[in-house]
Amino acid sequence: MVDDSHNAPFDKTKFDEVLEALVGLKDNEGNPFDDIFEELPSKRYFPDYYQIIQKPICYKMMRNKAKTGKYLSMGDFYDDIRLMVSNAQTYNMPGSLVYECSVLIANTANSLESKDGTLNEEENEEMESSINEEHKPGTNEIDVPKVIQNILDALHEEKDEQGRFLIDIFIDLPSKRLYPDYYEIIKSPMTIKMLEKRFKKGEYTTLESFVKDLNQMFINAKTYNAPGSFVYEDAEKLSQLSSSLISSFSEQPKEHSPATSKHEPEETPASPTPSVSASTSRERSTSVAPSFITSDQAATPDVLKSEEAHVESFSKESEKDQTPIPEDVPSPMDTLSQANYGAFALIKSFPSTPVPDFLNFSHKSVMGRSTFNMPNFPEPKFFEDIPNTERCILSAFICSPPQLPLPNPLRMYLPCPSLNSTEVSVITLAPQHSFLNIVINLNPALALKSYTIITLLNGKRLGAGVSTPPSTLYALEGIKHTEEPIRTVYEAKLSVGLNCLEFVLGSTEPVEPPSIEPGLPASAYSRTVERERFVLMAYVQP
């Protein structure tokens, strides 16, 4: 049953009370943030906002609509609140101040609108009502297990134009460590894996019970992800496909095999027929990389796949990177274990070669050394020594340059994947955050050792490596190193689309000379060996 407050006639007094409650909200530090949503962003400073956001809305516009009588029901007002939240989460990166404040607004508005905080129950009811009408006792009886199996097989085989399986995003739940807010927003998590487990246990005795869980999975995806995002669109397409298949199967008598007929859902041009064997579907689903990958999940490395067509040419399986890798350094792109909220919607998995061939891509990204005042970040972890099991590259700070007049500058802390140099960090950036200061924090124990840091952007080395000055080594000889991390600062201008930043730390090892030649420096009898590589994939939204 839909909450009556949504369809209730518009009440100006109730409107004022709800808006006052939303305006009075404060962030985690106790600071009000109503000014962020009071008016629309400046067209002068944020022209791209009005290219990305098609229906801008703010508190001021809501007051004007209430004053001029444009709200016919309280539901119209709450719909504008949800639109404002969706706009904020579409334009701003997850983890930013605006994004986090929008989540708080959404939760508060939902609880005010309905006592039990139910969201989007209309979609469940529409699906269930259509099923109840089409599957009443005495009408066309169907083989429920066979229909469910065909629906699952069809969902597993649905692809987009680039050949990407849409169901991959819905196989597993997000990591609680990487996405803690997911479980605060989504109260009834559901995945394809959970559906299949219940199906195998025989818990779905009716088609209605299966469709209810299936529809819950799509509602969760459309609640947590903003409209227009990859996940939201995939959920919409799969929801249309499942609805079409259910309608088609319900029209067939039990003795008729649904696997022999073709079903072409509307508005899904590349949809497969449901005549897919269960064994074929299960074999494919076990080989794909799940959209949320944690350190305890193994995924077969695949080619790099991105949402943008201009990157597609670099993700062919036939491409082989010839960059040599020392035997003691694993390939840096074997697995994807760290990801930002939106990253899984843009990138599926990474190749096993160390660096994709981005050199032929016509990008305008630049990078160089930079000096600036360090923001107040939390101190990174450090180590007293550097055994083989500890990291030398500790973490990275990413922030907007202080000279840019941004109302919501970016500030991000990225811990390096612990004890595993094969993991990759992935972030999604809003267009206004394409100018960055990147701070690499090194283990302070390196102050007593000879090391080299090399930076690469899209596979191309940028400038000379930053090495430890010999004078520093002599001055610190025999002195215990400080606990302050060694920081190297870079300034980067990233282009729209996918950017690959790599920070390679090498150490110098002595090499026995073939013969003693007077006059040669000691460096002539040494070599640089790659020890660690921190890889950051940054996707700048268009």
Swiss-Prot record:
Low complexity bias (residue ranges): 268-280
List compositional bias (Acidic residues) regions by residue number: 119-128
Q: Which UniProt keywords apply?
A: Bromodomain, Chromatin regulator, Nucleus, Phosphoprotein, Repeat, Transcription, Transcription regulation
Which GO MF terms are attached to this record?
A: chromatin binding
Which parts of the sequence carry Phosphoserine?
257, 271, 287, 313
Q: Name one GO biological process term.
A: transcription elongation by RNA polymerase II
Task: Name the segments for region: Disordered.
Answer: 114-139, 246-327
Report the function annotation for this chain: Component of the chromatin structure remodeling complex (RSC), which is involved in transcription regulation and nucleosome positioning. Controls particularly membrane and organelle development genes.
Name any one Pfam family assigned in the record.
Bromodomain
Kindly give the InterPro entries that the UniProt entry links to this protein.
Bromodomain, Bromodomain-like_sf, Rsc/polybromo, RSC4_Ig-like
* All residue ranges annotated as the Bromo domain in the record: 6-116, 139-249
Subunit record text: Component of the RSC complex composed of at least arp9, arp42, rsc1, rsc4, rsc7, rsc9, rsc58, sfh1, snf21, ssr1, ssr2, ssr3 and ssr4. The complex interacts with histone and histone variant components of centromeric chromatin.
Under what name is this protein listed? Chromatin structure-remodeling complex subunit rsc4
What's the name of its gene?
Answer: rsc4
What segments bear the compositional bias annotation Polar residues? 286-298
